[in-house]
């Protein structure tokens, strides 16, 4: 059965919603493994429909939230005759979202794009076609002892990823390796295997709290080695890091995601890492999203460049045993020169580059004549553009403003992720975002860089 057969069987009442979801998840996994990404995306959308239907039926989301999802679902997957609960909601509240019940009883939508970007209508239609007919999927590479023994995977995402992993694991002491893989190319697996394979400490320096949380959750999910998994930590700004520091002191910690500020300003944490270097226990240092260091280090967060001084001290204390990794999907020649000046090793530097152009993005610039005009444009874009969707704003107060405006439009299943978001709430939001519990995020730069979600389809910079 394909995704249409399973979904239609559910609509006909032949199978329950829980049975349909189980079958659809198994199908989605098989489609992903076989590289049929368009069909995989539609299977995931069907699974998300089951979630939204349950959320609506139990009162956890409003009718407007459900209608907004139904609009996207029909444009992505197709028109169907839905259960009475759905058609009644469409008849009552679908009009503001362009959702209606057609003469044949199927739920349909009016195809409409925001006025500000009408000239891009054809491209938006391409997005809703989910790349059908394209052949851009990466070709998998056979697995080996590394992935079989230490992770839940059986194959590598690509031959390039496999080579990158082997280069990283076999890097000599006191060397720096720069690895460039395309977005979605699987750089996170490199840090996970470094931690699992060597049984010493790997420290990953990341630019944002959201990225640290995301990579922490990925590592917990992907690593199968239980000893490594229970000794993975993410530094909690303003939180309790005593267990993590104890893990460093007792030499049980395997993988830590942190920021340069935490290393430089955290007295106990910095001291523990310094001792770990001297004891030869700190073995791998990874700078993730390394391309931001030259700009952020000079103009915004000098700790990124100051950290290079600390790293040099660690190398001396370790007897030049520490290995350094610079990971990114975006590296120009001048950035590479700066990074090797900052983080290069005396014994040698190496590059592994598999850069690739991303074909799918389209950049659209919209004029606005006032704050009110801009707000109206943003609200229209949220309602009409493909989702999942992120709206980036400058500061938390603006994020709250857009939440208020969207609530006035009948939307409640919308959340914010900013510097004001508490740690526990950040963890929950990331988990819900990755699990497709909601489709719209209003965020500042605290969210996003390197956060792994494969189906984000629209980014709006407000």
Please place each PLM-identified region on the residue numbering.
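Helicase motor core with emphasis on the C-terminal RecA-like subdomain
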Residues: 159, 169-178, 182-198, 213-236, ...
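Conserved pre-motif I regulatory segment
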Residues: 130-180
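Gly/serine-rich nucleotide phosphate-binding loop at the start of the catalytic core
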Residues: 204
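Conserved Rossmann-like nucleotide-cofactor binding loop
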Residues: 210
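Short acidic donor-binding loop at the edge of a beta-strand
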Residues: 201
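Glycine-centered small-residue hotspots that permit tight backbone geometry or close packing
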Residues: 118-123, 149-154, 184, 297, ...
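N-terminal accessory nucleic-acid engagement/regulatory domains that precede
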Residues: 1-137, 249
């Amino acid at each position: 059965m394909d995704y249409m057969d399973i979904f239609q069987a559910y609509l006909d009442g032949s199978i329950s919603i829980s049975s349909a979801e189980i079958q659809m998840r198994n199908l989605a996994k098989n489609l992903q493994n076989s590289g049929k990404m368009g069909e995989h995306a539609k299977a995931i959308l069907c699974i998300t429909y089951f979630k939204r239907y349950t959320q609506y039926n139990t009162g956890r989301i409003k009718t407007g939230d459900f209608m907004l999802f139904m609009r996207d679902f029909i444009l992505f997957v197709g028109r169907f005759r839905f259960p009475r609960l759905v058609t009644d909601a469409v008849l009552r509240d679908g009009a503001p979202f362009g959702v209606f019940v057609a003469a044949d009883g199927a739920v349909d939508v009016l195809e409409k794009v925001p006025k500000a970007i009408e000239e891009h209508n054809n491209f938006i239609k391409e997005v809703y076609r989910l790349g059908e007919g394209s052949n851009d999927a990466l070709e998998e590479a056979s697995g080996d002892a590394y992935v079989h023994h230490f992770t839940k995977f059986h194959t590598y995402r690509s031959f390039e990823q496999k080579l990158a992993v082997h280069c990283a694991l076999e890097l000599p002491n006191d060397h720096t390796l720069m690895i460039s893989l395309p977005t979605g190319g699987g750089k996170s697996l490199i840090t996970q295997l470094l931690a699992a394979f060597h049984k010493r400490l790997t420290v990953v320096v990341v630019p944002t709290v959201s990225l640290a949380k995301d990579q922490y959750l990925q590592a917990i999910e992907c690593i199968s080695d239980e000893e490594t998994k229970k000794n993975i930590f993410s530094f909690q700004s303003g939180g309790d890091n005593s267990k993590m520091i104890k893990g460093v002191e007792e030499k049980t910690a395997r993988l830590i995601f942190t920021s340069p500020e935490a290393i430089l300003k955290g007295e106990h944490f910095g001291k523990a890492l310094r001792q770990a270097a001297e004891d030869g226990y700190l073995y791998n240092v990874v700078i993730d999203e390394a391309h931001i260091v030259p700009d952020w280090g000079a103009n915004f967060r000098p700790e990124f460049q100051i950290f290079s001084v600390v790293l040099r001290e660690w190398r001396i204390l370790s007897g030049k045993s520490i290995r350094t990794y610079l990971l990114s999907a975006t590296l120009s020649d001048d950035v590479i020169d700066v990074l090797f000046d900052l983080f290069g090793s005396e014994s040698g530097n190496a590059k592994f580059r598999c850069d690739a152009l991303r074909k799918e993005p389209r950049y659209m610039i919209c004029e606005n004549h006032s704050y009110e005009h801009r707000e109206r444009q943003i609200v229209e874009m949220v309602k009409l553009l493909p989702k999942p969707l992120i709206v980036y704003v400058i500061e938390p107060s603006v994020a709250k403003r857009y939440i208020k405006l969207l609530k006035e439009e009948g939307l409640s299943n919308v959340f914010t992720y900013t510097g004001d978001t508490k740690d526990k709430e950040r963890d929950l939001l990331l988990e819900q975002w990755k699990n497709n519990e909601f489709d719209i995020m209003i965020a500042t730069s605290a969210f996003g860089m390197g956060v792994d979600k494969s189906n984000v389809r629209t980014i709006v910079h407000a």
